[in-house]
Amino acid sequence: MAIVVSRSESGLSATTSFQSLDNLAGASVSSSFTVPTNVSSIKSLSIALACDGAGEEFCGLVKISGNAMRDGDAVFATGGQMTMGTSTGSNMNFVQYDTDLAVQPGNSCEFSIATTTNAAIDVVVTAQFA
């Protein structure tokens, strides 16, 4: 059976520097989590990203880091965002990656995000372990 871990941010003032994701919906949680026992890899990564569409154009980068990552940090593109043309527009995307990132059970891991241009975003990252 697969195990999933998710982290999110709402209204994050994202910048070109990586920021840890330390929420799960409305709850504040630790950005770092322990890789579950009896798993050996991250099999998929899902990223949902949205902005208000009022003039923000950027690409996002999600990083998985920590001493659980056997081959070092992994960075994934979130997909690009662009202006929708009105202040009431919306912009969102979803990407999913099939991966085989080796992890060390019992060690720690975290998700963080950076953007190519500063932007106010909502983001959810989910990793599936097996």
Task: Describe the residue ranges of each PLM region.
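C-terminal interaction-tip segments
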Residues: M1-S28, S32, P36-N38, D52, ...
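Solvent-exposed serine/threonine-rich low-complexity stretches and specific carbohydrate-binding patches
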Residues: S8-A14, S20, G72-S87
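Tight coil/turn sites that cap or link beta-strands
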Residues: G26, N38, S87, G106-S108
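Extended extracellular/luminal ectodomain segments enriched in beta-structured repeat modules
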Residues: T37-L45
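Noncatalytic modules at the cell exterior or secretory-pathway interfaces
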Residues: I47, D100-T117
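Short amphipathic, basic-aromatic surface patches that mediate peripheral association
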Residues: I47-G53
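Short, surface-exposed beta-strand/strand-loop-strand elements in extracellular ectodomains
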Residues: G55-G72, V125
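Beta-sandwich interaction modules
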Residues: S87-P105
